[in-house]
Structures are given as structure tokens and as C-alpha cells.
């Protein structure tokens, strides 16, 4: 369910259903439905989205620097639709999402 929005991405490339979040959602869900109709559990990956990274996550930890609006409208959209359509298998990616680390740090801070 990765939206391939970075042409320099060394990992995703042709492993994505495209550059458009809507099209990736539709094709990914159709593929998942086809798998599950034959008794195979579908697993969507790489949550929360590995399509706009420039590093190979098998070699280093890519950093996702997008704000919440961008994450919601591009990277997370296919995963949201996948879950909404009743699918549940999701594999996380090896990614450092800056925004989430900031939020988690604030939530865990004793100075809240």
C-alpha cells in the first residue's frame, strides 16, 4: 500500500501500485480482496508508508518528515481504506516517523 511518490526511492519502485493515493488504495484493496477470496490472508505493507523515502530500510533507518496533513492524505490513505474495507493484516515498515516521535515524546513526558 506504499504510494511511490519519490522517484529516487531505492526500495519501493515497481512494488507499488503507483503514485496516486486513490489509485493505490483501489488497486491494493482489489488485490487484497482477490487474495482473501481464495483463502489467503492479505497483509498490507509498509505501514505507515515507505513510498517517499530515499534510503533502503534494509541498510539504514529511513526518516519520514511529513506533517500530519501530508501523512493523512498520502501515506496513510491506502491503509485507512484497507482497514475501513474490513481487512486487518498490516506489516509495519522500518521507518522513523518524526511527527509520531514528537507526539509520543510529549505523551510520555512527565511535564504534560
Give the positions of each predicted feature:
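Second-shell residues forming the walls of enzyme active-site clefts
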Residues: 19-112
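Short, conserved phosphate-binding/catalytic loop or strand-edge motifs used
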Residues: 1-11
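Active-site-proximal loop motif in hydrolases
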Residues: 16
